[in-house]
Amino acid sequence: MNIEHILPENIEKRSFEIIEQELNGRYIPPMEKPIVKRVIHTTADFDYLDNLCFSENAVEKAIEILKKGAVIVTDTNMAKSGINKNALKKLKCRVECFMADADVAEAAKAKGITRASASVDKAALIQEPIIYAVGNAPTALIRLDELIKQNVIKPELIIGVPVLSLIHISEPTRPISIS
């Protein structure tokens, strides 16, 4: 294995060059390509080329929603930390993660549910346009699906890339439908 020595300021650029080479001319819709490349850059996982799915016009809708001053709700503080605060400020958006909130922990314990589910319940009270970014908790996606079916919420956008849970592995995998 050869180690390529790169100046710190060139690491990201070189990473994207390598990704582009690995794509080997593969077609990715132009609006989705920067996102796919960013996911691969962040994870070093080229399987996302085959596993990342976008709903029709999802990127265009996301841009439109962000321009309206959306609230992005994440299921981890790490995801919250990774969202560009300067971009949020320019767009008059904000990002929230309720997972560590005392009231969420209390609600989860009282209801016998996960903090992820209780966090979704808390986020359901937000009145602004909302984007859910779920990258860790399958129960957050399950709760979102329940609240959508009950017509309690109608999120503008859901980004769901949760870890696979052995508990939920037997449940059929299907996308959450938002019309």
Residue ranges and their predicted role:
Residues 1-30:
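Charged, compositionally biased N-terminal leader segments and the immediate start
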